[in-house]
Amino acid sequence: MAQPASPEERSGLTKLLWFGIIQIVGMVVGWISVFSIFGLQFSNFPGLSRLPRNATQAQVSAALGPFFQNFSLIIPVDIAVGLVAAVVLTMGLRDMSKVDGPKFSVPWKLMLLLMIGSALAGVSGYLIFNALPAIIAQAPTTSRTPSSAFFSAIGSLLLAGLVAAIGGLLALIGLIGGEILGLWRVGAKYDETLLKLGAIFVIIPLLNITAPFLVLIGAYQVKGRLERPM
């Protein structure tokens, strides 16, 4: 008869279940927020429709400002949900490393890079969206020299972009070496195809929408098998 699951295995798989649930909830909240903001801005927001035919940059900036500010609110929410999911997955992979250290010690540590990189990219993205209206308003026309405020805003934007790029690189390393590799190895350890598919789909556009569902179902099936050893 197969060995019963250890407490660490049960704990790790339970955290994988919660990882999938949190990602699904975050995805739903994110889509609702995006559609709500676009609907409010372009259907009910009067600023854009009231712009004169030859609107100045300041007028365009004032009209688009609320859109950029509202859209920037999605970033902290998305990053916060993503970080919570990453923390849960990190704890789950760390539990699994107590059962099989060679397979899971590296992925759970690389998950830390994913969290750090996501936080850096999220903060930078928030600053970029908030700075865009001011840059539009201060952008020079053909008849005047750029102001010092414009150069200052551009400098801040470039710095935020650099930090976002660094954060994105760290997040990518963590995503591949931490989340994808970790989920794949859990699927390989327990011969669960859905977990391995979920790991692959994480990085594929459009298919990544299905990844949390595959991880959730796969972890549930593995946990069920371990709790009822044959």
Task: Cite the ranges covered by each PLM segment.
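Membrane-interface extramembranous regions at the lipid-water interface
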Residues: 1-155, 171-230
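Extracellular-loop-to-transmembrane junctions of the mid-late helices
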Residues: 161-172
